[in-house]
Amino acid sequence: MKCVDLFSGCGGLSLGFELAGFEICAAFENWEKAIEIYKNNFSHPIYNIDLRNEKEAVEKIKKYSPDLIMGGPPCQDFSSAGKRDISLGRADLTYSFANIVCNIRPKWFVMENVEQIKKSHILQDIINQFIDFGYGLTSAILDASYCGVPQSRTRFSLIGKLNSEHNFLIPTLSRKLSDKPMTVRDYLGNSLNLEFYYRHPRNYNRRGIFSIDEPSPTIRGVNRPIPKGYNINSCDPKGVELAKVRPLTTIERSYIQTFPKSFLFSGTKTDLEQMIGNAVPVNLAKFVASAIINFEKEPIRSMG
């Protein structure tokens, strides 16, 4: 199936869908640093467009006649990782995503976002819009560690299919979930040459040290060194030698996001940390894409 990626960032969603067997025709993004990385890793075009300009976007997307439109509208207005202030103006891009999809009416769409979007009236607004335009909807909160990602990262997915019943994809998604969460060691073995690592907590009441024998916490857009005189938190693993603890490097964090070692990253540390932290984990995207492909291959169900 042919698809286009809106708000593509550096390409986590694109790569996951490509690995699952989709043909990515084009991507759309307006952060130049992310566009440069995307171009270095994909052969199809990427357009530098502010998707608030819906007319221009629709004209370009229609040329590709996509079977599926996917995207993760910027989520800072919903995310607990940043200021949750819808007045800041990023949330209107969620409406732009819905407007573009409903104008083009591909057979499928996938919208990916943070779990907190469920608390926003915007989600109900666009759900009503999609239903009015004939989409059956499946919404799911997926823990990436059960979807082939060594990271406890919960994300919200809204998946639409024209002329379908609601919740149509739930059985397929459920069958594909792993029985247990994936740990860092499960995914990377001993290649990190460490047993414990530091992830800077949002506040010092939370743990900062993690074992590779558990899923990583959410990879965020910042990465800081362990402070001098770090006080062991009661929830940190017991018996850890602080002298042997370090934060993961930028590229190691991309591995936790399941970008392959062959994926080319370049740029400043600050930009890369933000790009990698904002990306949809590649294997989570592949998980959703594979569920769609499997659903398409299943025998036609009786409507009776």
From Swiss-Prot:
Disulphide bond pairs: none
Domain SAM-dependent MTase C5-type as annotated: residue spans: 1-299
Top-level division of the source organism's lineage: Bacteria
GO molecular function: DNA (cytosine-5-)-methyltransferase activity; DNA binding
Catalytic residues, chain numbering: 75
Catalytic activity: a 2'-deoxycytidine in DNA + S-adenosyl-L-methionine = a 5-methyl-2'-deoxycytidine in DNA + S-adenosyl-L-homocysteine + H(+)
E.C. numbers: 2.1.1.37
Keyword match Transmembrane helix: no
One record GO biological process: methylation
Pfam families: DNA_methylase (PF00145)
Keywords, in A-Z order: DNA-binding, Methyltransferase, Restriction system, S-adenosyl-L-methionine, Transferase
Enzyme class: transferase
Gene3D superfamilies: DNA Methylase, subunit A, domain 2, Vaccinia Virus protein VP39
InterPro entries tied to this protein: C5-Methyltransferase, C5_DNA_meth_AS, C5_MeTfrase, C5_meth_CS, SAM-dependent_MTases_sf
Function field: A methylase, recognizes the double-stranded sequence 5'-GRCGYC-3', methylates C-? on both strands, and protects the DNA from cleavage by the HindV endonuclease.
PANTHER family named among the record's database cross-references: CYTOSINE-SPECIFIC METHYLTRANSFERASE, DNA (CYTOSINE-5)-METHYLTRANSFERASE 1
Family according to the record: Belongs to the class I-like SAM-binding methyltransferase superfamily. C5-methyltransferase family.
Protein name per UniProt: Type II methyltransferase M.HindV
Native source species: Haemophilus influenzae (strain ATCC 51907 / DSM 11121 / KW20 / Rd)
Source species taxonomy: Bacteria, Pseudomonadati, Pseudomonadota, Gammaproteobacteria, Pasteurellales
